Amino acid sequence: MQKEFAFFPGCVLSQAAIESKKSIEAIAPVLGIKLREIEGWSCCGASQAQCVDPLATLVANARNLALAEQMNLPVLTTCSTCLLMLTRAKAELDRGAKDQINSFLAKGNMSYQGTSEVTSLLWVLAQNVEELKSKVKKPLSNLKVAVFYGCHSLRPEKDLGFESSTNPTSFETIVKALGAQVVPFEKRLNCCGFHAVYPAESSAMKMTSGIINTAAKSEAHCVVTPCPLCQMQLDIYQEDAQKIAKSKERVPVLHLSQLVGLALGIPAKELGLNHNVIDATKLG
């Protein structure tokens, strides 16, 4: 297992999903991983910025990657949308945009060389699942889990390319290594609705409600996702979505790092479970 990474938290971990950052920082040393946060990182520009000014967004992400290169480390992020943006930027730069973008970076005495790879917590754990399994102190044998990949852990497959976007297995493999039971969950590859909340709130709420109700029907004790944006949508908006749907079902939604932490024997509070909106503290 790669032991040291240039950590790109992204905006959401710095504000709205502090429990995600708290939990990954709690599990990293137990797994023997050193996270060095990229000093001076900037927003990846997903959604708004990339639509308004794609060139500026590419420059910003080239800068983020260049900062990691200065650390001589691969980039690790837990946000699937950040993963997609950084991976796409690297691919575009490596295909020939590097010289143009470096002309902008040069104004800040920086340059992109293409030496740092981009990965995610999901991918790192999947690639080292036996090592993860060996560190489990509290097998989650009584826990039924609905795994929810979300969009940007898998799609577009041509940009990410880690595994099949229609028949992925990495997440299930990780959860089973933690000792938990993976329940059949037909919405595991669906969109959570996060990026539709503002332009199409009604549709987003239907997506959220459908996911939660399907998880409940599968008798899952919790939904777990590798993406903090998916977690926010399914957790923070769950109450509103279920009221609109007139559903009484409520299901805790965990970050992948929180589930891993429970299996490693880390106390629930250290994993930020008290920050989750739908009560998840009983799971720990």
From Swiss-Prot:
Name of protein: 8-methylmenaquinol:fumarate reductase membrane anchor subunit
Single annotated GO MF: oxidoreductase activity
Chief site of localization: periplasm
Gene3D superfamilies xrefs: 1.20.1050.140, 3.40.50.11810
Its EC number(s): 1.3.5.-
Topology in membrane: Peripheral membrane protein
Catalyses which reaction(s): 8-methylmenaquinone-6 + succinate = 8-methylmenaquinol-6 + fumarate
PANTHER family xrefs: COB--COM HETERODISULFIDE REDUCTASE SUBUNIT B 1 (PTHR42947:SF1)
Gene of this entry: sdhE
